[in-house]
């Protein structure tokens, strides 16, 4: 071992003794795509603070290579799917998702449920592969981890925590209908003023919108399921050797790190073991690559527009690409378009195509005037952080809801990807660039995001570090988790009080009838006399 690495290891060990906390061993149940990108930001910060982080991932994991040099440790377990097969399945499901007609409530959510069930069948198989692998489980037991860190959208982290008898912390953006947040996290979302996620409503609802919101709540409560819950409940019961459910196991999480922020989310109640850490991945812009910087500078006073539909959508039809290219060619700004496909015929001289762009650095550039986005949460937080108004072209899942939030806050214009014309896109860009109100509104949100007593990333890491030495955070866990559904809604108390009232009414009624009978009998007797 070189002197350099010996010094590094010595410094890490010393930091364990002289820092405010102690170094811990963190086991991570790996997520995919943007979920993994968010987790990785927190994990890197944990490593910098001297903690040992081990990522448990399947051999089919998409976004990272365990063989790459990294400060993270990887424990890879074999699974039946290959990386290519898993990626192809994800891409097929994303395409199905994007193609669902959004004008029909029942059709949209029934097909969305079908897609989610197929994906969660794969996730359950991944979970089975790891808990049934005696070699891997023995190694995990012997490693004596202090905590499990997982994304609640990808179940199994909580099962591993139960098997290893350690505490766990969740990272979560949201689940459809706030299902997991309500049933496992105990969070409260009054439908009278909190729009259910994926409803595309704001918190300023009319009467009919509140009716619509209530219908959404009932639908997600009694009909929609993210996965086949019976299979998950049976699987968890078999593994743990006692009757249990997925929601019950997830409900034992010590801390919920919600990737939300009051600059983005509508105000609503939340619990002591929940913290909003949305935007923790945002950071000041770094210098752009030389060629890209020269192109940006060539825009002069007009500035540039950044355009990205995310990493999952890798291609689009030639017709849609040309509709977009035609609109972009007519604006005075230069355009940097993340696009992985054939060059559109209508592409203007002011537009350059890139397979990848440093999105955060571009949004933080002083010449950036607008951001055309699909509405992914990470991109929206970066736009808020840097104060860039948006044109939203949502595609699927939470994206329409995210753009609805930004539109309600006056920071974005929304378009429909499948029906928008070149004129629609052109007018939307002119609106967010030339109307100063959009810039003012996004700057208000940016100041809110920046003006926090503790940075979101520091808070996220703090709670993970807090749970390890304290062996949990039971003092923050509300007693609602220990109640049955009828106790939670006080139905037993209401029933008891109604029974008491009914008993009193019954006794009073009987007493009155008895008195009436007595007086009537006395009256008849007096008449006979």
UniProtKB/Swiss-Prot annotation:
The keyword Oxidoreductase is assigned to this record: no
GO cellular component: endoplasmic reticulum membrane
Enzyme Commission identifier(s): 2.4.1.17
Membrane topology: Single-pass membrane protein
Glycosylation site residues: 315
GO BP annotations, alphabetical order: estrogen metabolic process; xenobiotic metabolic process
Record keywords: Endoplasmic reticulum, Glycoprotein, Glycosyltransferase, Membrane, Microsome, Signal, Transferase, Transmembrane, Transmembrane helix
Broad class of where this protein is predominantly found: membrane
Positions where N6-succinyllysine occurs in the chain: 135
Subcellular location: Microsome membrane; Endoplasmic reticulum membrane
Signal peptide location: 1-21
Protein task: UDPGT is of major importance in the conjugation and subsequent elimination of potentially toxic xenobiotics and endogenous compounds.
Family: Belongs to the UDP-glycosyltransferase family.
Designated name of the protein: UDP-glucuronosyltransferase 2B11
